[in-house]
Amino acid sequence: GGVLAASDADNPALAFVPAAQDGAFGRLTVDAGGAWTYTLGAAAQALAGGEVRTEIFTVTLNDGSVTTATVIVTGTDDAPVISAATGTIVEDATPSIGGTLTARDADNPTLAFVPGAQNGAYGALTLAADGQWTYTPGPAAQALAGGQVVTETFTVTLTDGSTTTVTITVTGTDDAPVISSGTGTLVEDATDSVGGALTASDADNPSLAFVPGSQPGGYGTLVVGADGQWTYTPGPSAQGLAGGQVVTDRFTI
């Protein structure tokens, strides 16, 4: 602001006409004494750093004469306002999670995110130019134990080179092991034994194994190794079976 001056020996009542005027980048107000104030408006935020604009306002006095007030506006490089994001997902509860990042820069109305995909330790993040993001757990998340919590942070970039982050918390669940059963058929005195292999897998327990040992049954003995290999050998009681008689031995491993 400042003060405009006006004097007229023939008109001691000379004064400015109080008024407010809107310019392209702000508003000028003048009172009767010539005091003026210029207030920046929203449009000034769009000026790039170092960009210079001039506003000229015509000011009227009460005798009809006019003068001008000139204001020079210089823009500054406004920092962009960028959000970060967090997300939480439970293994196997949902296939993915997502959200929206926001970015605003008065000096750069075309500011956008750089789209792409990033692989993390437990999943992948995909990002669109408009800030839409999706996180999808990968196979490594299956190895998390029940209740185990891990966090991974992705850094995403905008077209002006600035960055922000997406932080994901992944909680593991107790995956049920996948275990096969086994069956075998044996004819008395035709073969000495019958065998096969049981399988077991558990994403939460890669060291899962069978408890080795032997179990007597009604008509023979089952032997199981830690790797699931099993052998059934008929015992003396099998000799008591009549021709064509069929019996079943069941074992819990």
Where do the protein language model's features map onto the residues?
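Acidic, turn/loop-rich segments in luminal/extracellular domains of secretory-pathway
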Residues: Q21-G75, D92, Q118-G172, D189, ...
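Extracellular ectodomain surface segments
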Residues: G1-D22, V81-N119, V178-P216
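Glycine- and aspartate-rich repeat motifs characteristic of hemolysin/RTX-like Ca2+-binding segments
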Residues: A35, A79-A85, Q132, A176-S181, ...
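Residues at or immediately flanking beta-strands
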Residues: T68-T70, A79, T110, T165-T167, ...
